[in-house]
Amino acid sequence: MLKFFLLPLFAYLLGSIPWGLIFTRLFTSVDIRHEGSGNIGATNVARIAGPTLGALTLVGDILKGVIPVWLATAIAAPNDLWGEIYISLVALAAFSGHLYPVYIRFKKGGKGVATAAGCFAVISPMALVVLILIFIMFVCWLNRVAVASLAAAAMLPVAVWKDTGSGVLTGCAVVTAIFIYFRHIDNIKRLLAGTEPIIWK
């Protein structure tokens, strides 16, 4: 019984690990929170510290979602109502940790896209495949990560519903998408002003 209560806490603490900040401090003299967009996620790390550290950050942030949600599916029955509620709770705990990391005083967290991808890689792999294709399409079309992230987030609940038919898991996807949009408010403002950075020049 104790593991049912400990896993959401573990998910939050794991989700709180600021890999972007850790990698940039280990391998450079940069504090990523004060460079570029100030975000600790993979996109800003890649822009400021290079693609290798950006890729390491991306993998670390994805695993923050994969590991606890996979453990949740091992504990709870994925096709059971209470199992779906528990899995969603664990996923949202990991996602919340990434957004509001306790280790850096709940400030300067990431925008949630990579950790959400890790969560839904376990919850709904087929939905994630569709969202990755949407992400790639928008990156190639508009050359901006923020637009691709927002487009994928908008389609997340639809893709999860189509794949799983679960109201609980779709609700988890809706909450996730709303927070991703909330964390991208500055990007949306820059997009409207025409100042959002492009990927390739």
Locate predicted features:
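Helix-coil boundary and interhelical linker segments in multi-pass alpha-helical membrane proteins
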Residues: M1-L7, I67-L89, A121-L128, V160-C172
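C-terminal ends of transmembrane helices
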Residues: G20-L21, F95-F106, F135-L142, I185-K189
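Multi-pass membrane catalytic core of lipid/isoprenoid biosynthesis enzymes
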Residues: R47-A74, Y86
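N-terminal signal-anchor transmembrane alpha helix
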Residues: L2-F27
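Hydrophobic alpha-helical transmembrane segments
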Residues: F5-F10, G54-A55, I87-L92, V129-L133, ...
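Interfacial segments of multi-pass membrane proteins
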Residues: A46-G50, A72-A76, K111-L142, A154-D163
